[in-house]
């Protein structure tokens, strides 16, 4: 259980004391399921007041519970979309200041996420939050597969922990399967969200080619992008099927 405590302590502001443990990579999706369940509870309870309020409250909660780290990743990577030169991108992504690109990217990611959530009813939105958050963490984990770090630091540590890819991937994917089984009545609608894993991995691969590696910001952005795409795919399936 040290790996789970380490994951909760590292990724969230939940007051759990634990050192960074190598087994943390086995608990990415469980951490996502926990935070997703918390966000879903907020969404469900506030949706009876107003759907938009519920969406804003739950997304705000997710930004805060992760200590603003993933939101910061969106801001950091956002500015790099404004330039094409790889070396300039590396300088910009490490810059503590944020420009137009970061602000626009931030609003695109989170306004679309809020808009998508506001289109669900209380039950659908709650399920979508749990699943999309779990898949988001799985996408972050998979972003480390066949990757190297260009900046050192925490990304290099996590990539070194990903030394048993099949075992780690299988264990994390079991959590997603469990969620599908719990919400089996909605499996036809929710299974399309798995496509977001492929799309977000393609995004990571694209960024890795540009930067000649990845860092914590790319990993964090991949998770936020995966959540958005998951919600979009779930919403489309609910509307069309």
From Swiss-Prot:
Keywords from the named record: Cell membrane, Cobalamin biosynthesis, Magnesium, Membrane, Transferase, Transmembrane, Transmembrane helix
GO cellular component, one term: plasma membrane
InterPro entries documented for this protein: CobS (IPR003805)
Entry membrane topology: Multi-pass membrane protein
Transmembrane segments: 24-44, 48-68, 103-123, 175-195, 218-238
Keyword Cell inner membrane attributed: no
Compartment(s) where it occurs, according to its Swiss-Prot or TrEMBL record: Cell membrane
Signal peptide from the UniProt entry: none
Domain of life: Archaea
One GO BP: cobalamin biosynthetic process
Pathway of action: Cofactor biosynthesis; adenosylcobalamin biosynthesis; adenosylcobalamin from cob(II)yrinate a,c-diamide: step 7/7
Cofactor annotation: Mg(2+)
EC number: 2.7.8.26
Pfam family, one: CobS
Family from the record: Belongs to the CobS family.
Function: Joins adenosylcobinamide-GDP and alpha-ribazole to generate adenosylcobalamin (Ado-cobalamin). Also synthesizes adenosylcobalamin 5'-phosphate from adenosylcobinamide-GDP and alpha-ribazole 5'-phosphate.
Name the record gives this protein: Adenosylcobinamide-GDP ribazoletransferase
């Amino acid at each position: 259980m040290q790996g789970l405590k380490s994951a909760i302590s590292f990724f969230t502001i939940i007051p759990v004391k634990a050192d960074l443990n190598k087994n943390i990579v086995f608990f990415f999706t469980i951490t996502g399921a926990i935070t997703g369940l918390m966000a879903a509870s907020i969404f469900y309870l506030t949706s009876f007041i107003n759907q938009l309020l519920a969406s804003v409250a739950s997304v705000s909660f997710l930004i805060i519970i992760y200590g603003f780290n993933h939101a910061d990743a969106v801001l950091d990577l956002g500015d790099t979309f404004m330039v094409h030169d790889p070396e300039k991108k590396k300088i910009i992504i490490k810059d503590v200041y944020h420009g137009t690109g970061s602000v626009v990217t931030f609003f695109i990611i989170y306004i679309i996420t809020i808009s998508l959530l506001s289109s669900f009813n209380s039950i659908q939105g709650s399920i979508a939050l749990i699943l999309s958050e779990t898949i988001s963490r799985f996408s972050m984990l998979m972003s480390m597969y066949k990757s190297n770090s260009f900046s050192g630091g925490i990304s290099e540590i996590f990539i070194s922990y990903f030394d048993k890819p099949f075992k780690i991937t299988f264990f994390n994917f079991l959590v997603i399967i469990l969620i599908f089984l719990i919400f089996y009545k909605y499996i036809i609608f929710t299974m399309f969200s798995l496509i977001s894993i492929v799309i977000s991995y393609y995004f990571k691969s694209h960024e890795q080619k540009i930067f000649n590696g990845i860092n914590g910001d790319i990993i964090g952005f991949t998770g936020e992008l995966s959540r958005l795409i998951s919600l979009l795919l779930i919403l489309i399936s609910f509307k069309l099927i």
